[in-house]
């Protein structure tokens, strides 16, 4: 899940995003056995708002194994709002659509107004934004390589 921490809300409360009571994901110990006592001790609710929690900005089901979320300068994509890149790693056992990739999100008023999926075909372990030269440097774990993403 991606959450925007907003401490400037109307009632001066610290927002609660629900973990570990609410999540669109599954437990780390997930063995697909709903009779597992751990599910009874800490069930996950699919809805956040229904239980008084803040809904996430974005969630991925199944999980894409987010490695890093990094904000970039408005000049990187000529946006009016904020822009984020999200690196993903996936798992060695079950690769699914959206894993081993990079996501771009343009935000305005804490809402996604544009998103882009960029297939990388390698685990994106780390991302650095070079603001001075306006490009991203990524460490790709699967290939043991560095990659540069620059606006064309």
Which residues are covered by each model-predicted region?
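Conserved blade-ending motifs and adjacent loop-strand segments that build the rim/top face
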Residues: 110-131
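A generic structural signal for well-ordered alpha-helical surface patches
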Residues: 100-103, 122-125, 144
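Generic preference for flexible, low-structure residues
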Residues: 33-35, 118, 143, 152
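Blade-level signature of beta-propeller repeat domains, shared across WD40, Kelch, NHL, RCC1
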Residues: 128-152
